[in-house]
Amino acid sequence: MKNHVQTHNKSLDEINNTVSINTHGKFSQKLFSFLGPGLLVAVGYMDPGNWITSMQGGAQFGYILLFVILLSSLSAMLLQSMTIRLGISTGMDLAQATKHYLNKPVAFVFWIIAELAIIATDIAEVIGSAIALDLLFGIPLLVGALITVFDVFLLLFIMRFGFRKIEAIVGTLIFTVLVIFVFEVFIASPHVTEVLNGFVPSSTIITDNGALFIALGIIGATIMPHNLYLHSSIVQSRMYDRNSIQSKAHAIKYATMDSNIQLSIAFIVNCLLLVLGAALFFGVNTEQLGGFYDLYNALQNQPLLGASLGAIMSTLFAIALLASGQNSTITGTMAGQIVMEGFINLKIPNWLRRLITRLIAILPIIICLIVFNSNEAKMEQLLVFSQVFLSLALPFSLIPLQLSTNDKRLMGQFKNKLWVNIISWCLIIILSILNIYLIIQTFQEL
């Protein structure tokens, strides 16, 4: 590796070093000034991809996959804290650090995989938004998918009001989703003992190929590659002293608190989704268990709710789904910009970047809709496959993150502690082994 020299461009230059922080007030005031980037990252942990994998996990295997959500969320907290340290201590995002650390041909391969991961993320957002538009307004899935092309202009409009406003809008939408699902799980009345037992490890997760497939989907939907790139960049939006070790340490401390708080909320939402799927569907013999349409119809026809309340709750569910898809669009756009600028130093207009990504993402969806005659179950299956691809792509983000954050020449006193190295390498190795096992099993069953 080359010696680190601060010659790289600023990450996301338009928001870099633009948000003031409180360094002399009370603890709560200091923390509040850092709250925000974690919200944008948490969005990726509760996007439509999480919805379908968590709901299908609950519907097909009851509560046993709650342990996977817990493990994934704790792992995510550690990994996001590593991206925070990388961004604040070096002034580089993960894409820039990867390019800096690897030789050009290898970095190019990693860039392609990062771009494909962002497209896979976008597929989930398009499908979720298209289904929400169908549920709310009866818009055909094909038309709904095409309509999502125009949300490319959403971020451009919101960005005019400043980065802090984006954080506030995203936070409001996340809170809305949380409240909706807390109430819906309350109505579904799951058995508390069974839910708590779901957090205990079960061998079924490994021995049952179906459970392993959904478990990897949950991991892929929870620990998302684009979030690692995103977080390492947007933490640099705060106006800490770039030349002060003490100021950087202060920023890392509060940015990590922000991250852990928001990821805890995302953890709760994902658990609620799985519990909802299990409470309504586990043991029910249907062709497609725990899909968006199934859950929407179940809420609408839930005897406990009655006709009027059922209609309200199913509509709220669809609104939350649409909000989730749009939230993820905001962060996906930023991540795409970070990856393209960081790896190949190519700056193109945001609207064009977004349009290219969205058009590529829509292509497999349109093919799926045409070939399977707008079959809803096939759309939801495509979404699950997109999440499994994210799980396969994850090591290509994790390995550069691990190598970069453990390099003293790059990180100085902020390099990884021994326990961080042990856990992060274990995560990378275990995930890689599970991925290889899954691929072998999948091909054997073809």
Curated annotation (Swiss-Prot):
<comment type="function">
    <text>H(+)-stimulated, divalent metal cation uptake system.</text>
</comment>
<feature type="transmembrane region" description="Helical">
    <location>
        <begin position="355"/>
        <end position="375"/>
    </location>
</feature>
<dbReference type="GO" id="GO:0015293">
    <property type="term" value="F:symporter activity"/>
</dbReference>
<feature type="transmembrane region" description="Helical">
    <location>
        <begin position="420"/>
        <end position="440"/>
    </location>
</feature>
<dbReference type="GO" id="GO:0005886">
    <property type="term" value="C:plasma membrane"/>
</dbReference>
<dbReference type="InterPro" id="IPR001046">
    <property type="entry name" value="NRAMP_fam"/>
</dbReference>
<keyword id="KW-0812">Transmembrane</keyword>
<keyword id="KW-0472">Membrane</keyword>
<feature type="transmembrane region" description="Helical">
    <location>
        <begin position="32"/>
        <end position="52"/>
    </location>
</feature>
<dbReference type="GO" id="GO:0015086">
    <property type="term" value="F:cadmium ion transmembrane transporter activity"/>
</dbReference>
<comment type="similarity">
    <text>Belongs to the NRAMP family.</text>
</comment>
<protein>
    <recommendedName>
        <fullName>Divalent metal cation transporter MntH</fullName>
    </recommendedName>
</protein>
<feature type="transmembrane region" description="Helical">
    <location>
        <begin position="139"/>
        <end position="159"/>
    </location>
</feature>
<feature type="transmembrane region" description="Helical">
    <location>
        <begin position="381"/>
        <end position="401"/>
    </location>
</feature>
<keyword id="KW-0406">Ion transport</keyword>
<keyword id="KW-1003">Cell membrane</keyword>
<feature type="transmembrane region" description="Helical">
    <location>
        <begin position="107"/>
        <end position="127"/>
    </location>
</feature>
<keyword id="KW-1133">Transmembrane helix</keyword>
<keyword id="KW-0813">Transport</keyword>
<feature type="transmembrane region" description="Helical">
    <location>
        <begin position="59"/>
        <end position="79"/>
    </location>
</feature>
<dbReference type="GO" id="GO:0005384">
    <property type="term" value="F:manganese ion transmembrane transporter activity"/>
</dbReference>
<feature type="transmembrane region" description="Helical">
    <location>
        <begin position="264"/>
        <end position="284"/>
    </location>
</feature>
<feature type="transmembrane region" description="Helical">
    <location>
        <begin position="303"/>
        <end position="323"/>
    </location>
</feature>
<feature type="transmembrane region" description="Helical">
    <location>
        <begin position="210"/>
        <end position="230"/>
    </location>
</feature>
<dbReference type="Pfam" id="PF01566">
    <property type="entry name" value="Nramp"/>
</dbReference>
<keyword id="KW-0769">Symport</keyword>
<dbReference type="GO" id="GO:0034755">
    <property type="term" value="P:iron ion transmembrane transport"/>
</dbReference>
<dbReference type="GO" id="GO:0046872">
    <property type="term" value="F:metal ion binding"/>
</dbReference>
<feature type="transmembrane region" description="Helical">
    <location>
        <begin position="168"/>
        <end position="188"/>
    </location>
</feature>
